[in-house]
Amino acid sequence: MEQALTGEAQSRWPRRGGSGAMAEAPGPSGESRGHSATQLPAEKTVGGPSRGCSSSVLRVSQLVLQAISTHKGLTLAALKKELRNAGYEVRRKSGRHEAPRGQAKATLLRVSGSDAAGYFRVWKVPKPRRKPGRARQEEGTRAPWRTPAAPRSSRRRRQPLRKAARKAREVWRRNARAKAKANARARRTRRARPRAKEPPCARAKEEAGATAADEGRGQAVKEDTTPRSGKDKRRSSKPREEKQEPKKPAQRTIQ
């Protein structure tokens, strides 16, 4: 089956140079009514035919023949799966003449004699482009010329801020220490201030007056402790006043 299909595809290959695409046949002949896959000429682009068109067409035709041979009843889902595994994208061709963006360089494919009969547009899925730079190494591997990197810490980025904070903290501590020392000195000076010395004569006079007053009070208390009647108390009230009168000027002179 594969030999018949490959021979049929080679017989339909155009002899003109530059096109590099398979010509469409009117349909399968009466002798071989099996699955057939033919490719239409690629759509013309503004830049002209691509150099790798012939190789891509051959590759697609081989993939289609392989899918037909492996699957007894080839379906559209099976055909798409086989082509996607090889890195191609498959879309059914619509009635529009212009191909959408990204499918301008697609190869036209015609499949007949199976459940997946129809016209399809097949193109290679482009790999995502990477920005120019160093090639990434595999995880867990390091370049031989590099030394083992130390664990990075986020504190290095905050060095200027941390330096300013340290300086401000030191200034604050110095000011606090200076204030504490000044307060301690003020307390010491307050405690060590000498009291104003009084003259010795005034002190002696005050002490003598205080002792005399204490003695007079003691005598008065002793006299009061003796039991007396009401008349005696009235009589003794006058001499008490007479006794207390001479003491008042003595207290005034002491003050």
Curated annotation (Swiss-Prot):
Annotated Gene Ontology cellular components are: chromatin; nucleus
| 4Fe-4S among keywords | no
General function of this protein: Essential for normal spermatogenesis and male fertility. Required for proper cell restructuring and DNA condensation during the elongation phase of spermiogenesis. Involved in the histone-protamine transition of sperm chromatin and the subsequent production of functional sperm. Binds both double-stranded and single-stranded DNA, ATP and protamine-1.
Where does this protein reside within or beyond the cell? Answer: Nucleus; Chromosome
Q: Which GO terms describe its biological process?
A: chromosome condensation; negative regulation of DNA recombination; sperm DNA condensation; spermatid nucleus elongation
UniProt lists the family membership as follows: Belongs to the histone H1/H5 family.
**Residue ranges under compositional bias (Low complexity)?**
142-152
Q: What is its main location?
A: nucleus
| Keyword terms of this UniProt record | ATP-binding, Chromosome, Developmental protein, Differentiation, DNA condensation, DNA-binding, Nucleotide-binding, Nucleus, Phosphoprotein, Spermatogenesis
- A GO term, aspect molecular function: double-stranded DNA binding
Q: What is the lineage of its organism?
A: Eukaryota, Metazoa, Chordata, Craniata, Vertebrata
According to the UniProt record, list the residues that bear Phosphoserine: 56
Question: Which tissues does the record link to its expression?
Answer: Testis-specific.
Q: Which domain of life is it from?
A: Eukaryota
UniProt lists compositionally biased (Basic residues) regions at 124-134, 153-166, 174-194
Name of the featured protein: Testis-specific H1 histone
Basic and acidic residues composition bias: residue spans? 195-230, 238-248
